[in-house]
Amino acid sequence: MASSDKPLHILDIALQGGGAHGAFTWGVLDGLLQEPRLAVGAVSGASAGAMNAAVLVSGLVSGGREGARERLRSFWKELNKSGREAGPLIPMIEAFPETTRAMSSWWTTMFGDLGMAHGSPEMGREMQDILRKVIEEHVDFAAIASDKAPPLFISATNAQSGTARIFRKDDLTTEALLASACLPLYFPPVTIDGKDYWDGGYSANPPLVPLVLESANDDLLLITVNPQARDQTPRNAAGIVDRITEIGFNQSMRKEMQGLFLLQSSIGRTRAKEGLIAQVERMRFHEIHDEETLAAMPAQSKMLPVRQLLLTLRDAGEAAARRWCEASIESLGKESTVDLASRFGPG
C-alpha cells in the first residue's frame, strides 16, 4: 500500500447489515483504515452495519485511524465474549469446530426454520440488554455528535408504517442502534418517541439517498454482506426461508441502486439539473463484497458470533479491501468501479 500519509481520496461508505456476518465489514474497514490514500467521509449503516458505522466514527474522532481499528476489534471481541457468557451454545460450537459445519441442519432439527428459534420475541430481551451494554462500552455518542465527526446515517424501520427512519449524528442513541438491529422474530421492538421500530435492514439496508443528498463527496463505497445471487433455488423449507430473508434484506438496497442507476442513465436527456439530479450526476459508485465466502456461510451463523467465524470473516474482509484498493483506488475521483447495470439493474 502507499507510503504517503496524505489522504488523496475521501470515500463515503455505506454498510449493509448481516448479523455476525458483519465481521466481514469489520475486516473491510480495517483494511481501508490501513490505506493512507483514503479518508472516511460520511458513513451510513443498517443493523450490524449500523454498529460498525457508529463504532468506526467513535474511534475516528477519539483516536484517528488506529483508534478506529482498535475500537472495532474490541467491539467484535466483546460481542463474542458476551455471546459465550450468555449460554452454552457458542462455547460448544467453539469447543467442537465440526459442529459449525453441521450448524444449519442441527439448528433446523432443534428449532425448526431460522425464524422460529424463539417462541416469543420477548425471550430475546436479555440478549438485547447484553448488546446494549456492548454498545455503551464502545460507542461515544458525544464524539459522534461533535463537529469533528463525519456525517452518520443509521436506519431503523417503523414497525407500523413500514417506513425508514434515518437517525443522524445529533439524535443517535443506544436505543436507535438497538432498533436498527432489532430482528422482530428474535427481539421485542425498540420504542423511541412512542413508536416501535424493527431492523433497519427492512427499509434501508443501508441508507443511500442521505449520502447522495447530504454529502459533498462524489465517491460512494458500498460494503455488502448478503449475497445478491445464488447458484441454485432452495427446495426445502429451511432453505426457502433463508433465501426469502436474504432477498428481503437486499431488496431496499437494490431498489435504491436501481433508482440511482436509472436516474444517472437518463440525466443526459434532462435539461434542468438541480437537487437530486445534480447530485446523482456527479456520483461515482464502488462496491466491496465477497459473495463466494459469504454464500458458503449457513444463514443461522448470522445469529452466532462464534470466534472462528468472526475471525474468518474479518480476514476475508481485509483481503477484499486490499484487492479493491489495488484494483480501484486510481479510479477514485474519475469513474465508478462497479457496473450498476449488471450488478443492480432490472432483470
Language-model-detected regions and their locations in the chain:
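Charge-dense, low-complexity polyampholytic segments
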Residues: 67-74, 91, 330-346
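A short, acidic, amphipathic alpha-helical segment used as a generic capping/interface helix at domain edges
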Residues: 265-275
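Short, glycine/charged-enriched secondary-structure capping and boundary segments
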Residues: 27-30, 58, 168-170, 211-213, ...
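Short internal beta-strands
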Residues: 43-44, 222-224
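Acidic, Ser/Thr-rich peripheral helices and adjacent loops at domain boundaries
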Residues: 234-266
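Patatin-like phospholipase
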Residues: 6-14, 19-129, 133-135, 171-179, ...
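Active-site-adjacent alpha/beta core region of enzyme catalytic domains
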Residues: 89-223, 230-232, 276-298, 302-312, ...
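Small-residue-rich anion-binding loops in enzyme active sites
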Residues: 1-11, 149, 159
